[in-house]
Curated annotation (Swiss-Prot):
Pfam families: Terpene_synth (PF01397), Terpene_synth_C (PF03936)
Protein known as: Bifunctional isopimaradiene synthase, chloroplastic
Species in which this protein is naturally found: Abies balsamea (Balsam fir)
Catalytic activity as recorded in UniProt: (2E,6E,10E)-geranylgeranyl diphosphate = (+)-copalyl diphosphate; (+)-copalyl diphosphate = isopimara-7,15-diene + diphosphate
Transport listed as a keyword: no
Pathway(s) per entry: Terpene metabolism; oleoresin biosynthesis
Residues engaged in binding substrate: 252, 472
């Protein structure tokens, strides 16, 4: 109903009088126009109070005498658009069943995780197939591997991963297979086809970027080429490009100090089959892994076994073949890699809530093998890499495990640069991206994280400028899109629903990695993850659309659309809650979060647009006393605000009582009283042109930013009964809530202080700091505020991770409320000017546009 002159139909409010008492009687409160008079009648039950009202048509000074009308951009989202969101996007019953099936199948994937699922490596299988029978007969010890080679040649005559064509990979695998078949004098047809493939395709390697080159290629390929020549295989040995590769190998071998090869484990252990002429086999055995392998490489381990007859090498190969049957992968195990990347994948796709137990089991496993020097792709891998280590550090830390950022020092050189392996200069886009993502989850004083952030940002931005940039370690569907998102929406600006939407579009179910050969990880990249992510996203979006429609109807029926002094931002505000508390079970939490946020916005505009401090103090007193009798003395617009507020929070208080098992209206009143006191103080500052000190300003402004008010009410709906002790850990006196308010206030001020100064508002973090330090410039003050904010965000990280006295969902609510402010004020005032900023695009993708 609309509040319009000369009509009987006016906003109707259902209210509770004396809601704090045990009686909790429900009565009807509403406004109506008195017939033939300029009075509004507030009716409570059978009684009514007449309040004089001057029509705006008869008195143009309505706003000048009470409220100063401020010009705001109109709401961007029109009713017809919101109303058009129909059930056509709702998940059908068949899709609900499919979701259940996919969840069950993915749970089973996690339960089946052992040492790592991966595809065959023709290259490594060829090396294992070379091993002669231990009884001295002229037969292979693993004849099943020879048979696998014979049966798995591709149609073009090559061997290798069939889904991806990489000339380096195919040529390497094909050369290994034709040598093995020649050694066993079998597969003449296959050898002939393989040689033909080599002759016609070898030149393509020259056209591929160096970053496409498999790990250790320049070591193992020339060595095998030399062996092929001895065997008399008809290959184009005189190709200039092949000669260049041989020269690179010779140059690299000269750079390898002999003492380094045997002093400590390095990635050279991964390619010992290509170093046979220089290896001291007795010395190299000191670097054998506990599982009997050499850096988890079947090819390297097979070469060592053929040279030494070491039983542990053979045990490892038997172990791998027992798992895979008649072939081997390019490295194994991959247990840490598989678990970390699977967890990261379901989290980024936004489906992790379905797999909480499975994720905990996976991370418990990783943590049990965590090493302060870093980790590799397998639990007993002696050579840690920055990719697995950074991924582990970030995920384990965010899940509450005690891990130190000092682990990254293993991978930093004397120039402050970060590399994938200790003592090497190799790095790729995906490993630097993982280090960058990790660096944002920093705690105060962790300089190594800041160094990692600067180094990786520089590297990744340079990679984006290079059109031909290709990742060293992975074949990703859209690695460029992943990097662009990560650099633009860093950890404190990336909301879960937005990241899920982006990653669903960038995720490749057929993504592969590049080690010594191309390999795939089916428990990391598969169609099931993607299908579930799409269905789940659309299901949640449908729920959110219905909730948004209800909230907009509430806004209109409450009469707020007639308040000309405030902003209508129902859709943007609802988006702010749905972007992180998106699960179905938090529906009421989202509703309360949105309604509380709307009232803070109305009150903010009310107190900013004041004409009389007495009116504002009256309003604050009415909230404090929860007293309807003060309605008579309020201006008309203030009356609508108070009645809508009064009734809404009486209803909320009743729902809180059901959920928390006690009457908490007093708690709710107190939360609002604290906020309105902060508003009043700011109004007094504004009217007197007072500029407080920086500390005085922050003490008040970290409350007036309203985030604490919103959180302290909506946290009562997270599904847990909260004790007074828990509430004390997130009240306005707590460090956690202060940091949330502080970071929110500072990011707001950095983007709005100039515009507000133009409107006569003198107090901001920047202006107050300049008052304390008159010798500095505005730019210096702004930089100081940014530094304070960044330090506070690091403290907030630590509170979020380590404050175990606060339930996880409470922590999540506080932390993500701080993050949503960083997103909204990324470009400017994203709430007031949302129609001109990317916020409107985020709203569309999160709430309106389903995923096909």
């Amino acid at each position: 109903h609309h509040l319009t002159a000369n009509t009987q139909s006016i906003p109707h409010f259902s209210t509770t009088l004396n809601a704090g008492s045990s009686a909790r009687k429900r009565r009807s409160l509403y406004l109506r126009w008195g017939k033939g008079s300029n009075k509004i009648i507030a009716c409570v039950g059978e009684g009514a109070t007449s309040v004089p009202y001057q029509s705006a048509e008869k008195n143009d000074s309505l706003y000048s005498s009470t409220l100063v009308k401020r010009e705001f951009p109109p709401g961007f989202w029109k009713d017809d658009l919101i109303d058009s969101l129909t059930s056509s996007h709702k998940v059908a019953a068949s899709d609900e069943k499919r979701i259940e099936t996919l969840i069950s199948e993915i749970k089973n994937m996690f339960r089946c995780m052992g040492y790592g699922e991966t595809n065959p490596s023709a290259y490594d299988t060829a090396w294992v197939a070379r091993i002669p029978a231990l009884d001295g007969s002229d037969n292979p010890h693993f004849p099943e591997t020879v048979e696998w080679i014979l049966q798995n040649q591709l149609k073009d005559g090559s061997w290798g991963e069939g889904f991806y064509f990489l000339a380096y990979d195919r040529i390497l695998a094909t050369l290994a297979c034709i040598i093995t078949l020649t050694l066993w004098r079998t597969g003449e047809t296959q050898v002939h086809k393989g040689i033909e493939f080599f002759r016609t395709q070898a030149g393509k390697m020259e056209d591929e970027a160096d970053s496409h080159r498999p790990s250790g290629f320049e070591i193992v390929f020339p060595a095998m080429l030399k062996e092929a020549k001895i065997l008399g295989l008809d290959l184009p040995y005189d190709l200039p490009f092949l000669k260049q590769i041989i020269e690179k190998r010779e140059a690299k071998l000269k750079r390898i100090p002999t003492d380094v090869l045997y002093a400590l484990p390095t990635t050279l252990l991964y390619s010992l089959e290509g170093l046979q002429e220089i290896v001291d086999w007795q010395k190299i055995m000191k670097l054998q892994s506990k599982d009997g392998s050499f850096l988890s490489s079947p090819a390297s381990t097979a070469a060592v076994f053929m040279r030494t007859g070491n039983k542990k090498c053979l045990d490892f190969l038997n172990f791998v073949l027992k798992k895979f049957g008649n072939h081997v992968p390019c490295h194994y195990p991959l247990d840490l890699f598989e678990r970390l990347w699977a967890v990261d994948t379901v989290e980024r796709l936004g489906i992790d809530r379905h797999f909480k137990e499975e994720i905990k089991d996976a991370l418990d496993y990783v943590y049990s093998h965590w090493d302060e020097r870093g980790i590799g792709w397998a639990r007993e891998n002696p050579v840690p890499d920055i990719d697995d280590t950074a991924m582990g550090l970030r995920i384990l830390r965010l899940h509450g495990y005690n891990v130190s950022s000092d682990v990254l020092k293993t991978f930093r050189d004397e120039n402050g640069e970060f590399f994938c392996f200790l003592g090497q200069t190799q790095r790729g886009v995906t490993d630097m991206l993982n280090v960058n993502r990790c660096s944002h989850v920093s705690f105060p004083g962790e300089t190594i994280m800041e160094e990692a952030k600067l180094c990786t940002e520089r590297y990744l931005r340079n990679a984006l400028e290079n059109v031909d940039a290709f990742d060293k370690w992975a074949f990703k569907k859209n690695i460029r899109g992943e990097v662009e998102y990560a650099l633009k929406y860093t950890w404190h600006k990336s909301m879960p629903r937005l990241e899920a939407r982006s990653y669903i579009e960038n995720y490749g179910p057929n993504d592969a990695w590049l080690g010594k050969t191309v390999y795939r990880m089916p428990y990391i990249s598969n169609e099931k993850y993607l299908e579930l992510a799409k269905l789940d996203f659309n299901k949640l979006q449908s729920i959110h659309q219905t909730e948004l429609q209800d909230l907009r109807r509430w806004w209109k029926s409450s009469g707020f659309s007639k308040l000309n002094f405030t902003r209508e931002r129902v859709t943007e505000i609802y988006f702010s809650s749905a972007s992180f508390m998106f699960e179905p079970e938090f529906s009421k939490c989202r509703e309360v979060y949105t309604k509380a946020s709307i009232f803070t916005l109305i009150f903010d505009d009310l107190y900013d647009a004041h004409g009389s401090l007495d009116d504002l103090k009256l309003f604050s007193e009415a909230v404090k006393r929860w007293d309807l009798s003060l309605l008579e003395r309020m201006p008309q617009e203030m009356k609508i605000c108070f009645l809508g507020f009064y009734n809404t929070f009486n209803e909320i208080a009743e729902e809180v009582h059901k959920r928390q098992g006690r009457d908490m209206l007093g708690h709710i009143q107190n939360v609002w009283e604290i906020l309105l006191a902060a508003y009043t103080k700011e109004a007094e500052w504004s009217k007197t042109k007072y500029v407080p000190s920086f500390d005085e300003y922050i003490e008040n402004a970290s409350v007036s930013i309203t985030l604490g008010t919103i959180v302290l009410i909506s946290t009562l709906f997270i599904g847990e009964v909260l004790t007074d002790h828990v509430l004390s850990k997130i009240n306005h006196g707590s460090r956690f809530l202060h940091l949330m308010g502080l970071t929110g206030r500072l990011v707001n001020d950095t983007k709005t202080y100039q515009a507000e100064r133009g409107q006569g508002e003198e107090a901001s973090a920047i202006q107050c700091y300049m008052k304390d330090h008159p010798e500095i410039s505005e730019e210096e003050a702004l930089n100081h505020v940014y530094n304070v904010m960044e330090n506070a965000l690091q403290e907030l990280n630590k509170e979020f991770v380590n404050n175990k006295e606060v339930p996880p969902n409470c922590r999540r609510l506080v932390f993500n409320t701080a993050r949503i402010m960083q997103l909204f004020y990324m470009q400017g005032d994203g709430l007031t000017l949302s129609h001109d900023m990317e916020i409107k695009d985020h709203v569309k993708t999160c709430l309106f546009i389903p995923i096909a």
